[in-house]
């Protein structure tokens, strides 16, 4: 009886341990909250976030990423538009990278409010420029 209980407890601890390792280092489920990535992602869509790929390669333009915001347990889902070292600017509703208009096949709408990006922004070595698809 005692041996059976110890065995059950061992497997319970093992399952929780493996689950913790997987969600911490490999992948994690998240839910889309809002329309900022519409039409690509919809409100309440469920996603699996890959936590491994960027350990082996750098993020690329047009990748969709999940990143933490300033507050604990708050994350954004956006698309990478500008890469480290590039200069990004939004003119007349379109994104320009290093002075060349960016071809965005996933987004046909013009950007209504360029905000700070109406002036050129040169990205640092570890900076990315991200936007939602719903502009």
Set out the residue ranges of the language-model regions:
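Soluble "head" domains of membrane/secretory-pathway proteins
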Residues: 2-6, 10, 16-17, 21, ...
């Amino acid at each position: 009886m005692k041996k059976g209980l110890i065995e059950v407890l061992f497997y319970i601890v093992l399952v929780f341990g493996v689950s913790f390792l997987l969600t911490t280092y490999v992948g994690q489920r998240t839910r889309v909250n809002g329309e900022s990535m519409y039409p690509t992602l919809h409100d309440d869509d469920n996603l699996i976030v890959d936590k491994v790929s960027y350990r082996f390669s750098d993020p690329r333009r047009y990748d969709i990423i999940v990143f933490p915001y300033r507050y604990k347990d708050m994350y954004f889902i956006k698309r990478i538009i500008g890469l480290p070292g590039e200069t990004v600017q939004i003119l007349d509703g379109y994104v320009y990278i290093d002075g060349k208009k960016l071809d965005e096949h996933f987004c046909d709408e013009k950007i209504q409010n360029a905000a700070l990006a109406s002036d050129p922004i040169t990205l640092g070595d570890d900076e990315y420029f991200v936007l939602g698809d719903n502009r």
